[in-house]
Amino acid sequence: MRFLFLMITLTALTGYILADEQPTFRWAVVHDPSIIKVGNMYYVFGTHLQVAKSKDLMHWEQINTSAHDKNPIIPNINEELKETLSWARTRNDIWAPQVIQLSDGRYYMYYCASTFGSPRSAIGIAVSDDIEGPYKHYAVIVKSGQVYSVDGPSEDGTPYDSRKHPNALDPGVFYDKEGNLWMVYGSWFGGIYILKLDPNTGLPLPGQGYGKRLVGGNHSSMEGPYILYSPDTDYYYLFLSFGGLDYRGGYNIRVARSKNPNGPYYDPEGKSMENCMGSKTVISNYGAKLVGNFILSESNTIDFKAFGYVSPGHNSAYYDPETGKYFIFFHTRFPGRGETYQLRVHQLFLNEDGWFVMAPFPYGGETVSKLPNEEIVGEYQFINHGKEITDKIKQPVRIKLNSDGSITGAVEGRWERKEHYITLKIIEGNTTVIYKGVLLKQWHYSEKKWVTVFTALSNQGVSVWGIRVEE
């Protein structure tokens, strides 16, 4: 009993004593992962019909790897999804599926197919009684890329215009707090749109055309929308990926928020995302950038053992009502490894201003709690993710959080903490920029030990991370 009391006390003090004190990981290969939890099992569905499952978010079992005709998720896929695939002029492939359970207890897979690099795309639905399939064709609900002389008008009754009409890709289906069903979707071309769905049938309510534009247009470089409601803040959070998805494309994850599921959405500076369209330079000024390219190495050459990501993006997110934790699921490439990619899962936290910040390392079972000052004061690797869309890989600089509240080293300023929250006041040129975030212990993915980290966000939508250099 004394030992149990000691363990509980230590857990309360440190927040990192876990059932598995040295977490291990087994990752799956899933591009554009979307999350659904069924019972005690998490499932992710991704492009090429890559599917995996896990009970702890750390050890993933690959269920399926490709959309061949003998796959168990959608057997005989070319015939089963013939209507969608024939419109998109493709075979043996679907992109960015998401599965949601409707009131009839069945599982509805919203998926898309496309002629690569063009807006000739369609979003369809397949349905199954079991989360792992087999799924059967149900409906095609949105088409894009119509050639007027051949296909007639677009979904809104006018000739299709790729500058203002959406590309029917990347469906993200969600319930709002009132139980209404919505689908956000879009990729490049005319921007990101949202449609209201019938919660009983899963089909779009009539008379909406393509729905309402939330962000983008004029071929702006953004895609992979996903909306998550937070009961803690009563906001809806719109996640997006800016940039190109390949290892040279500068893919990065951004977020904006709204009090309404169909917007308008605003970034931390209060800018409306409806105005976010244009070149990469223009759109990079919008949204809170949670993560982009980085490596925790200070070497001038690539250290293949160092922890880092390249083009992380196309995420989904999940709120666990039992634990109160938020998670983000995304694919990422890696420094020096070309187009190789895997699934990753990180924990999200709400800062004092109600904005999400992302933990630097993959989820290892940690729970945020108040840390003693002696585990905070010290030297850190410091990453500033900036706002730009770039293929450059951010590297850390060294800073110190001193016991007198000062920050010294490559950046200077002041820091203070309140419970598990941290505020950094960093001098940048002639101004002081305030970053608000959280402190916690995380399992250092490459060094295999628990370290103190912080993750924080400025009112300009810039994320910074600190990883304590443990002796």
UniProtKB/Swiss-Prot annotation:
Gene3D superfamilies: 2.40.128.10, Glycosyl hydrolase domain, family 43. Optimum pH is 6.0. It retains more than 75% activity over a pH range from 4 to 7. Binds 1 Ca(2+) ion per subunit. The record marks 314 as: Important for substrate recognition. Its EC number is 3.2.1.99. Its cofactor is Ca(2+). Transmembrane segments: none annotated. Substrate binds at residues 32, 117, 167-170, 187-189, 219-223. CDD domains: GH43_GsAbnA-like. One of its GO terms (molecular function) is arabinan endo-1,5-alpha-L-arabinosidase activity. GO terms for biological process: arabinan catabolic process. The record marks 170 as: Important for catalytic activity. Optimum temperature is 73 degrees Celsius. It is fully heat-stable (up to 10 hours) and retains activity at temperatures up to 90 degrees Celsius. The enzyme loses its activity only after 90 minutes when incubated at 95 degrees Celsius. Ca(2+) binds at residue 314. The keyword Coiled coil does not apply. It catalyses: Endohydrolysis of (1->5)-alpha-arabinofuranosidic linkages in (1->5)-arabinans. Residues 1-19 form the signal peptide. Pathway: Glycan metabolism; L-arabinan degradation. GO terms for cellular component: extracellular region. Monomer. This is Extracellular endo-alpha-(1->5)-L-arabinanase. It comes from Thermotoga petrophila (strain ATCC BAA-488 / DSM 13995 / JCM 10881 / RKU-1).
